[in-house]
Regions:
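Entry/capping segment at the start of metal-dependent catalytic domains
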Residues: 1-34
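A generic structural signal for short coil/turn motifs at secondary-structure boundaries
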Residues: 11-13, 67, 137
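A short glycine-/small-residue-rich loop at the edge of a beta-strand within enzyme catalytic domains
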Residues: 71, 95, 139, 221, ...
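Short, basic/hydrophobic alpha-helical segments
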Residues: 77-88
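C-terminal accessory domains and tails appended to enzymatic cores
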Residues: 210-241
Length: 241
């Protein structure tokens, strides 16, 4: 499970957004047999923009001064690939969305051309799995518009550590994947979140409260509003729609 922190302009222009610099990496390696977790974290000296944008510093608490003595992208990637170990034992490298991989590709290309080193992505690109895409295939559409922190809350878990710390982000992504992989009830509850928005919540303005009542029943066994009751109400909304 891997996460990058990026230094990018606060712009709505998607092309400009893809010019982001990688400034930190966090990853955890989870052994499915032993349940052992290993950690990797490093700052990364930026290639394009040496100054950290104010909104990025506020989010990540990474300063321009922090990055002045940070290891280069090439150095960090050599350490990271060594830390990954035997590629034959890797089931996947999991990210939350495709922006991390997009910026990784761009930085890898620029650094390779500028510093004449091999493309580090060449041997690992096929291992990448977008967690959002994985659970969209289950019908969990809210993965596209709900944050990792909120997804954990809806899964009856709290985010561990500081958000926008790449190591904590990677660890919490692992926790979310573990929960959703093993617990169909939680997946179904996340699928239900899609009914709690327009136009459905305009047809039944009590649907949010009903979903919360079911959450109490699901996670805390409070009340008696169960999945059958909620399903009937949802079918009624869809029928009226």
């Amino acid at each position: 499970y891997m996460d990058f922190e990026m230094n990018m302009n606060n712009t709505k222009n998607k092309r400009e957004g893809f010019k982001a610099d990688l400034i930190a990496i966090g990853a955890i390696k989870y052994d499915t047999k032993t349940k052992k977790i290993e950690k990797f974290k490093s700052l990364i000296k930026p290639i394009l923009t040496k100054t950290v944008y104010p909104h990025i510093e506020e989010l990540t608490h990474i300063t321009t001064e922090d990055l002045e003595n940070a290891p280069t992208y090439e150095s960090v990637m050599r350490s990271f690939k060594h830390w990954l170990g035997d590629f034959n034992e890797i089931d996947g490298i999991y990210t939350f969305g495709n922006l991390d991989l997009t910026c990784f590709k761009n930085t890898d290309r620029i650094s390779s051309q500028k510093n004449n080193h091999p493309r580090f992505l060449n041997n690992i690109q096929n291992f990448f799995v977008d967690i959002k895409e994985k659970y969209l295939e289950y019908g969990v559409k809210c993965m596209n518009y709900i944050s990792l922190t909120h997804l954990l809350e809806l899964s009856n878990m709290k985010f561990s550590g500081d958000a926008h710390d790449p190591l904590y982000d990677a660890y919490n992504l692992h926790i979310l994947d573990e929960i959703l992989e093993k617990n169909q009830d939680v997946r179904n509850y996340l699928i239900i979140q899609d009914i709690n928005k327009s136009p459905y919540n305009q047809i039944d303005d009590e649907i949010e409260a009903k979903i919360k009542d079911y959450e109490k029943y699901l996670y805390h066994k409070e009340g008696n509003y169960n999945i059958d009751d909620l399903s009937i109400d949802i079918l009624s909304i869809v029928g009226r729609y």
